[in-house]
Amino acid sequence: MGRCRLTRQPPEGERIAHLETFRTTITPVLTVRQAAQAVAFYQRAFGAEEIYRNTYPDGRIVAELTIDGARFRVADEAPEAANLSPEALNGTTVRINLLVADPDQLCERAIANGAVEIAPIADQSYGLRQGRLADPFGPHWLVGRPLTGRSGDWARTPDR
């Protein structure tokens, strides 16, 4: 892929400040074909905001997005680096669990923008109101919210 070009450089001193406040995180990277179009879909369907975008000389991108503070990345497929899209794999190996205040509304918007419903939103026995979508680029999303008045892991807000 070669060297990438940042479209936004961090302000002077930001990297040092970041190291002083470093915290372990997990950031999923969704490898897809047509990452720029996937970014536009996530913005329309999920209300995602783009934080940054790296553009490589061959036109492929890696972009970081956030949905209400939950970060994830979207990258163009790079077979030479063993980064394959769900289309190349003929399936997906990861499901993204997205908890939001109104999963019904978000799923309706996602479907209107091209997502496919795999399982409808419903109250689940494990304490979530949840459904499953496949986005137009292959990744699967479990969209839900904790059910109110329920005990168990999903009913509590994690302190992390």
Region roles according to the model:
Residues 5-29, 40-134, 143-160:
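Vicinal oxygen chelate
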Residues 31-34:
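Short, surface-exposed ligand-recognition loops at beta-strand->loop->(often short) alpha-helix junctions
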